Structures are given as structure tokens and as C-alpha cells.
């Protein structure tokens, strides 16, 4: 995924009302930009940290700027725009970069499934049958650790997706939970049991039911983001 033009750099003044952030651009101009992240963004930002944002030419947009990348207190880069995760995964799937999911004949997005009115991020069709894939964006890192964690806040939606995947898996359908780790310098992912113990328990139950859990790490820069390597998933 290339940013054209490359992202612009600024400095964070504050994030507020979940979807808004005030920054100072490289030229010293104050600017309010959109923050496409509903999570806590724990350990992703600090007052005065460097941020990178994109601009939209759409005249109908109230806020032309979108916050894309943040420099974390640990000195890492984190893509805080959660909407990028699915696009990154789709790009990698179509390029055959996720070996465990290669060889599909069709890819469909936002496919209804399950009994709790869920939508799978992707359904991949193979001669042997469909595979349902849920994608989660991971940005929570810690001091002196190269292990990231998910989620960064209690996620009822994430727990529901685990239940839905597990139910399908018990019926003999292949299901995959894919962590898209949009945080530099990471080698493994774990459940953030201290933040959401119910999610961690649900993840263990889903794996026991046959849900495959994968993690792929991204390489980030103001010029672009791409998934480049498989990471370990810790139990």
C-alpha cells in the first residue's frame, strides 16, 4: 500500500471525542484531523509525539486530513487508522504473500455469517470449500518488549467474532483469525488478558474449536505500508 503523495508529518497536540485530533503541521500550522480509531490507542501516542497524516481532495469532507501513523512512546511506528488493516490484508492475499491462505479462486468482502448477525471480513473460496477470515488490527506495544497484544480495550465485538468463528469451525468449516500487526519492531502477538480476560478466554476456546490464528507484521513508513513477515502467536 503506497501513500501517494507521501504522508505529511506533524506533532500531536491532543486527541479528543474519539475521532478528532489537533496537530501542528511541519510548517507550524494548527490543524484538526480525523482519527479513524475507536479503540483506546493505548501506548500509541503521547503529547508532542510525531504523527503522519494524509490529505483528501474531497471538497465534501469536513476534515481533509486523516491521521495514519503515530510514533509511540517506545519509539515505534503504529498505523492507528484501523481501516487500513483490511486493505493491507487483501493486498497481501491477492499477491499470494500469506502462504497459509494461498490458492483461492475468489475473494469476497463483508460476507454475512453466523447466528449473531456478523460479517466476515473475507470469504475465500477454494475447490475444497470456503474459508472465513476475520482481521484484527494490532497496535498495542510495551516498553522493553517485542511482543504486541490485542485488544487495547474491552471488545464485545471481538468476542462475538471469536464465538462465530468457533461455531463455524465446529461444523467443519475452515476459519481463520488474522492479526494484522501495524506496529514496527514486533516478533509475536498475545491476548491482552489483563485488559480483556473474556476475550483471552474466548480466544483459547476458539483455538480449541479449530479456529486457525495467524499473525502478520507490517513494515511502515510515510511512503507506504505492507505486510512483510509472519509473526508468532503466543498462547
Curated annotation (Swiss-Prot):
It comes from the Bacteria. InterPro entries: SfsA, SfsA_C, SfsA_N. GO terms for molecular function: DNA binding. It holds the Pfam family SfsA. NCBIfam families: sfsA. PANTHER family: SUGAR FERMENTATION STIMULATION PROTEIN A (PTHR30545:SF2). Belongs to the SfsA family. HAMAP family: SfsA. This is Sugar fermentation stimulation protein homolog. It comes from Ectopseudomonas mendocina (strain ymp). The lineage of its organism: Bacteria, Pseudomonadati, Pseudomonadota, Gammaproteobacteria, Pseudomonadales. The gene is sfsA.
